Structure formats: C-alpha cells, structure tokens
Amino acid sequence: MYFLYVGVFGALGGMCRYAMNLWLGGGDFPSATLAVNLIGCFLLAFLMRFLAEKSRVSLVLLNGIGTGFIGAFTTFSAFSVDTIQLVQSGAWLFAVSYVLASFIGGLIMVKFGRMLSNKLLNRGEHRVG
C-alpha cells in the first residue's frame, strides 16, 4: 500500500513541479526550481507536523504526501545542475544568490511551516467545548 500512495502522490508532485516550470520557467535565473524547493520546505515542515499531531492521518498517507508528493515536487538535483550551469556561464552573482536563497530561504520556510503548524495546533487547544 505504501508504494501505491507514494507513486500516486509522486505523480501529482511531479505534475505540479512541471506546472511551476511552465509558469515560472525561462530567463537567466532558475526561479521555478527555487520556488518549488522553498514551497516544498514549507509544506513538508507544516504538513508533517500538523497532520501527524492534529488529525488521525495514517502513516501510509503521511509517507505518500511527504515522500511522494513533496519528494517529487522538490528537486535537489535540478538545484545542483542549475548552480553549475550558472557558474559555467559566468553568472557568479546569480549562482551565489541562488545558493544562498535556496539554503537560507529553505531554513526560513521550514521555520515558518513549523510556526504555522504550532499556531494552529495551539489554537485548537484553547477552544472551549
């Protein structure tokens, strides 16, 4: 069952990444890859914490979403290739900006994802009834 969930969610994540490339692709800067990786950092931190704590989501579904959808949506390999291509084309400023935005931005997005999940989880604890 795990393979089915990971496969289905992986297909959806790959299609969403492809759509982002169509929407944001082109130009000298790999903005589509940066966007999917930053969004993926936020989603993984938020969804895995929130779904694991709040709802009765099965481990199979969590793996499908985390490993399948977010794993296929994000791409470290494209980040690496994009960085090397920027360096080889002499676009050092773009390359350094891309690496810094990816790593620092990724950490910030994880922090925001966890903060939002914590806020929503704590809000539910304060309700009466």
From Swiss-Prot:
Na(+) is not transported, but it plays an essential structural role and its presence is essential for fluoride channel function. Belongs to the fluoride channel Fluc/FEX (TC 1.A.43) family. It is a multi-pass membrane protein. The chain crosses the membrane at residues 3-23, 32-52, 59-79, 90-110. Na(+) binds at G71, T74. Pfam families: CRCB. Its main location: membrane. One of its GO terms (molecular function) is fluoride channel activity. It comes from the Bacteria. This is Fluoride-specific ion channel FluC 2. It catalyses: fluoride(in) = fluoride(out). Keywords: Cell membrane, Ion channel, Ion transport, Membrane, Metal-binding, Sodium, Transmembrane, Transmembrane helix, Transport. It is found in: Cell membrane. One of its GO terms (biological process) is cellular detoxification of fluoride. PANTHER family: FLUORIDE EXPORT PROTEIN 1-RELATED.
